[in-house]
């Protein structure tokens, strides 16, 4: 087993234990979705076909990948697709967003996909929604330090700022 995969497994086990302890100690219970990834919209969104045949949209919790027409957007979508497309995945649902998407922690086997995308430098840690998630913060910090992915750019633009600018351009 490669050291990266074994580290992912260790983080998966620790994360799972933390979630189980949280669920046991409070009213928090996580809905878990399992199925096959049948589509990847971008670097932080996917389509999941559940075992029942129902298809649902999923947003990766705590990350914000580049938008279409933004630097690294295609690389992020391709990397996510290579990792999960047409594969069995598990989603620990934390919320449902205003677009009706399930927002959650996505796992492909033992690999925590949200963290993986940050580690590869293909997304920002979305602190607005996941400020206390140290695993995600640490993964982004490592990618930044290594100038990986979006961090190789001289002036990376956060996707939420990119979206805001596009909306302003549309208003003009």
What do these predicted ranges mean?
Residues 5-172:
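Small beta-barrel nucleic-acid-binding modules, primarily SNase/OB-fold domains
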């Amino acid at each position: 087993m490669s050291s990266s995969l074994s580290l992912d497994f260790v983080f998966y086990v620790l994360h799972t234990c933390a979630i189980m302890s949280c669920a046991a100690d409070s009213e928090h219970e996580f809905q878990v979705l399992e199925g096959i990834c049948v589509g990847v919209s971008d670097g932080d969104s996917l389509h999941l076909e559940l075992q029942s045949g129902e298809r649902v949209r999923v947003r990766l919790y705590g990350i914000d990948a580049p938008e279409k027409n933004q630097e690294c957007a295609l690389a992020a979508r391709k990397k996510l697709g290579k990792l999960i497309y047409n594969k069995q995945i598990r989603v620990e649902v934390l919320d449902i967003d205003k677009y009706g998407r399930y927002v959650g922690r996505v796992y492909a086997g033992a690999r925590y996909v949200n963290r993986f995308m940050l580690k590869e430098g293909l997304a920002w840690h979305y602190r607005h929604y996941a400020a206390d998630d140290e695993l995600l913060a640490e993964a982004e910090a490592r990618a930044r330090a290594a100038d990986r992915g979006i961090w190789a750019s001289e002036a990376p633009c956060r996707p939420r700022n990119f979206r805001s600018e596009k909306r302003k351009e549309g208003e003009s």
